[in-house]
Curated annotation (Swiss-Prot):
Protein's UniProt name: Exodeoxyribonuclease 7 small subunit
Enzyme Commission code: 3.1.11.6
Organism: Helicobacter pylori (strain Shi470)
Role: Bidirectionally degrades single-stranded DNA into large acid-insoluble oligonucleotides, which are then degraded further into small acid-soluble oligonucleotides.
Pfam families referenced in this protein's UniProt entry, alphabetically: Exonuc_VII_S
Disordered as annotated region, ranges: 1-26
Coiled coil residues, start to end: none
One Gene Ontology MF term: exodeoxyribonuclease VII activity
Keywords recorded for this protein, A-Z: Cytoplasm, Exonuclease, Hydrolase, Nuclease
Compartments (UniProt record): Cytoplasm
Family of this protein: Belongs to the XseB family.
Catalytic activity: Exonucleolytic cleavage in either 5'- to 3'- or 3'- to 5'-direction to yield nucleoside 5'-phosphates
Record's subunit section: Heterooligomer composed of large and small subunits.
Length: 86
């Protein structure tokens, strides 16, 4: 099950318009954006195009949140492992 949590797929393509200038989001911010996208995707009045755009955005948020979670787990594991160089 643990492997499933950290299994990542190929990263969705990023929107490069503002990616260089945008500050990095926290895990919580990505999770919140994902929740908002899911809420909007449940809107029955959402057009197909808007739904697809929103889905792509949600997948990007999910991927970035997973990467942050994976990095945090790896850092945790590193802290739990005694330094073998000493």
């Amino acid at each position: 099950m643990q492997d499933e949590l950290f299994e990542t797929e190929k990263a969705p393509q990023k929107n490069t318009k503002n990616a260089k200038n945008a500050p990095k989001k926290s895990f919580e911010e990505h999770a919140h954006s994902l929740e908002q996208a899911i809420d909007r995707l449940n809107d029955s009045n959402l057009s197909l195009k808007d739904g697809m755009d929103l889905y792509k955005t949600a997948m990007q948020e999910l991927f970035l949140a997973q990467k942050l979670l994976e990095n945090a787990y790896l850092e945790y594991e590193k802290l739990q492992t005694p330094d073998k160089k000493a």
